[in-house]
Amino acid sequence: MSTSEYDSYRPPEPEGGRRKRRRGGRGGSGGPEGPGGRRGGRGGNGRGGGWKNRGADGNREMPMVEDVEFTSYYGRPIVKAPPWGDEIGTYLFLGGLAGGSSLLGFGAQLTDRPGMRIASRMTAIAATGIGGAALVADLGRPERFLNMMRVVKVSSPMSLGTWILSGFGVGSGVTFAIELDRITGEKLLPLGPLRKVLHGMETPAAIESAFFATPLAAYTAVLLGATAVPTWNAAGRNGLPYVFVSSASMAAGGVAMALAPVAETGPARLLALAGTAGEAYAMSAMRKRMHPAEVDPMDDGEPGHKLHRAEKLLIAGAVGAAAVEVGARVFAKKLGGGWKTRAVLRGLSVVSGAALAAASAYTRFGVLEAGIESTKDPRHVVEPQRARLEERRARGITDDSITTGR
């Protein structure tokens, strides 16, 4: 028989030691009632439940199950894994890319950078369309997406995310139509007198898409953190939205570096470098604050491989982006901006931008798959719960869990 730390709270034993059980069974005597009116078949302390309640008045040890190492509930997982696949991973990546590209496009409009403006707006609408299609593919039928727009539930990240995506798509669609009309020489779209109206909506539409850009990049992290999946829930409490926003900035800056002229992508390079620094710091801080059992799925197996690839690509892309920035500011001026210099900088910009975008994609897929893996082993659920319980006990909180006594 074992004891618990709660034995320190029980009153001292009476003088003379422990009372011995009388003969005649587990009751107070052999008859129907023992001394003091206690009935046979009940424990010597007069409480119901027989031998299980011996010592329930606090005067001696109570039978307890000894501490055991938890393995599983009959070999079954405690938390059911969400039925999410590559479609959701694609949406996570493209949603962040769309949001970051929209911000870059708006900035390019304000600073008169037509090449980066066109590239960023085209990227934003393409990412929105493909990401939305991936989301619908995961839902199974398009009407399920429309059904989520029947209500607005502020407490639901999924409900808010539906409206964020829709609002962002409207603004991005208008700016895309304007850019398409410009590229085709105002000949493709039969707008007639409505052309001036369309072009007059450019700034309001750009502001709208920029307004929804950051929420679009961040809400998916809040959505994952609101689930019961161990790794996602812990990551959501410890900074996953910062990881996703930084990753989106890195991806958007990288794609702009790959598609737009080097002379115009200075803001994109700075955004990409800020995103790499932000993701590296936020990811490291998030891991340190999580329980080791919650971090394990992010280090092992295929999710761990993807997150390690993301780290390597992030470093390589950041070094390349910094080299392009230095080259564009220093060497191009000293060397006169010859075609060889421009070709080297252009090639390095494309490769570095692609590496940064790939790093962002690996981060999203790695986090997604790590959460799914964490549901397969009950240890990822039980050990963090026990650690949190012990922490509360150490602070004197013993009345907020069914596993603690009064």
Show which residues each predicted segment covers:
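Short amphipathic, positively biased membrane-proximal segments
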Residues: 1-406
